């Protein structure tokens, strides 16, 4: 399947829209915080591409993206409210509780079986798990034996886990990878800040081949 790692934000009228940043400055022809606009007000603006060129596209709602992608895309939800500087503990907890309400039976996301949650710690994963969330997988960082032991000791079965092993396969951590694979866990690297940034096309191709030869199960790329 195709994997999309997506970010979203709340509008002023509590509509969840796809938006990586908490502001619309970088990715649209508008300015300001997402939370300062209603969904309808945001439709005045158009998205720009990675080169800053204006496109005909508007900011989409999360539920429209979920409906479009069901049965063909696995969505990896990144909760930016967890690790963004300046976000209060109250807002962080509220965002976790919002996810839980949406994933529970009757919630807006409960009908979709193609959702994965990026979590930053075993404590965050356990918060979901202890609130009865069983209909998603968790993308968690396991880039050390300490990380592996923490999840091994948790009540979360390995079948709910995909392991993010950071920016590249590290030969010194082969034992960790072997333990993960023995549990049926897939490993994922992210090259968005490394190979993706190589400007020369030939050198970038070489960098990509190097990543493929390292044999992670999944490679995250922009």
Residue ranges and their predicted role:
Residues 3-5, 18, 76-78, 162-164, ...:
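Conserved beta-strand positions in the central sheet of alpha/beta enzyme cores
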């Amino acid at each position: 399947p195709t994997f999309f790692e997506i970010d979203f934000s709340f509008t002023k009228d509590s509509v969840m829209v796809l938006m990586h940043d908490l502001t619309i400055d970088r990715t649209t022809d508008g300015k300001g915080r997402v939370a300062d606009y209603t969904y309808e007000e945001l439709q005045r603006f158009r998205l720009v591409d990675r080169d800053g060129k204006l496109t005909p596209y508007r900011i989409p709602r999360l539920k429209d993206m979920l409906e479009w992608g069901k049965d063909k895309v696995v969505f990896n939800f990144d909760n930016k409210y967890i690790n963004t500087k300046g976000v209060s503990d109250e807002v962080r907890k509220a965002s976790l509780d919002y996810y839980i309400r949406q994933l529970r039976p009757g919630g807006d996301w409960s009908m979709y079986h193609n959702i994965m949650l990026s979590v930053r710690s075993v404590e965050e994963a356990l918060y979901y798990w202890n609130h009865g969330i069983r209909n998603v997988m968790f993308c968690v960082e396991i880039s050390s034996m300490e990380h592996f032991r923490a999840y091994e000791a948790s009540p979360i079965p390995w079948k709910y886990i995909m392991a993010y092993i950071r920016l590249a396969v590290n030969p010194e951590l082969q034992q960790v990878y072997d333990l993960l694979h023995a549990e049926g866990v897939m490993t994922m690297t992210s090259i968005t800040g490394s190979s993706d940034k190589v400007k020369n096309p030939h050198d970038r191709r070489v960098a990509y081949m190097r990543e493929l030869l390292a044999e992670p199960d999944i490679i995250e790329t922009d």
